[in-house]
């Protein structure tokens, strides 16, 4: 049984958007293949939320900036003794390739946005019970198509996100690996520190404590308050050890 729970908290708007996109893309593949109405609604709801997130900001622009920033950071390690130079060079080339693919890709989400079935389902998702067969006969007949035909269409939809997915995965992996976990101690359920221009907080907490963190702040300063899962009987120890990485 897992004894540590990892919590992640964004310290700026771009990281908040990236984590939401990562979560939604992961959710797209959870219930594949789509074999019934429930699985279809799970998939289309996540597609719809993804498109909503895409429409709120300059996702491509921010990712390109970060890909270039990560290249500059890696270039400072070239020639440093004791550093795996082949690994550094490989990462730089991967980042350059991701930039090239992302620049040449169509507008993020445009392929999904223009799909007729996705558009029809999106219109009904906000209506309680609005995806019944009499509301969406198009979805009803789609669910009765051969499984291979549905699978092929779903794969095409997901593949249209590959330029974004690959760039985002690389960026988030590098950010998450940019800082080690260090042991910290909260006093009376409270901890605060300087963020040091971090984008992301990562916090490991023992499951035995049955506590969760409420985090507030921004890249220069943040505060963590630990709360009991059982609000009536749970207790927060005077001193609580946890692991924290400011990435």
Curated annotation (Swiss-Prot):
Q: Mind naming one GO cellular-component term on file for this protein?
A: cell division site
Q: What subcellular locations does the record give?
A: Cytoplasm
Residue ranges crossing the lipid bilayer per the database entry: none
Where is it mostly found? cytoplasm
**Any coiled-coil ranges, and where?**
none
Q: Does the keyword Cytoplasm apply?
A: yes
GO BP term, example: division septum assembly
Assigned keywords, A-Z? Cell cycle, Cell division, Cytoplasm, Septation
Q: Which domain of life is it from?
A: Bacteria
- Function of the molecule: Cell division factor that enhances FtsZ-ring assembly. Directly interacts with FtsZ and promotes bundling of FtsZ protofilaments, with a reduction in FtsZ GTPase activity.
Q: How does it associate, per the subunit comment?
A: Interacts with FtsZ.
Q: Which family does it belong to?
A: Belongs to the ZapD family.
> Which PANTHER family does this entry report, sorted A to Z?
CELL DIVISION PROTEIN ZAPD
What's this protein's name?
Cell division protein ZapD
């Amino acid at each position: 049984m897992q004894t540590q729970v990892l919590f992640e908290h964004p310290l700026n708007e771009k990281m908040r958007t990236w984590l939401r996109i990562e979560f939604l893309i992961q959710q797209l593949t959870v219930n594949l293949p789509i074999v019934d109405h429930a699985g279809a609604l799970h998939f289309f709801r996540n597609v719809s939320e993804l498109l909503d997130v895409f429409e709120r900001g300059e996702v491509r622009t921010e990712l390109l900036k970060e890909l270039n920033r990560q290249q500059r950071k890696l270039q400072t390690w070239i020639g440093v003794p004791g550093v795996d130079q082949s690994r550094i060079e490989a990462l730089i080339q991967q980042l350059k390739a991701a930039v090239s693919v992302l620049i040449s890709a169509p507008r993020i989400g445009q392929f999904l946005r223009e799909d007729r079935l996705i558009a029809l389902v999106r219109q009904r998702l906000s209506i309680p019970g609005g995806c019944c067969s009499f509301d969406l006969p198009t979805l009803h007949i789609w669910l009765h198509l051969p499984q291979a035909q549905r699978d092929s269409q779903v794969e095409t939809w997901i593949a249209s996100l590959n330029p974004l997915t690959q760039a985002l995965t690389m960026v988030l992996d590098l950010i998450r690996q940019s800082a080690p976990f260090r042991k910290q101690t909260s006093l009376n359920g409270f901890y605060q520190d300087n963020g040091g221009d971090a984008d992301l907080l990562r916090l490991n907490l023992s499951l035995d404590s049955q506590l969760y963190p409420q985090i507030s702040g921004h890249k220069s300063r943040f505060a963590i308050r630990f709360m009991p899962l059982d609000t009536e009987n749970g207790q927060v120890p005077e001193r609580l050890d946890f692991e924290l990485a400011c990435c």
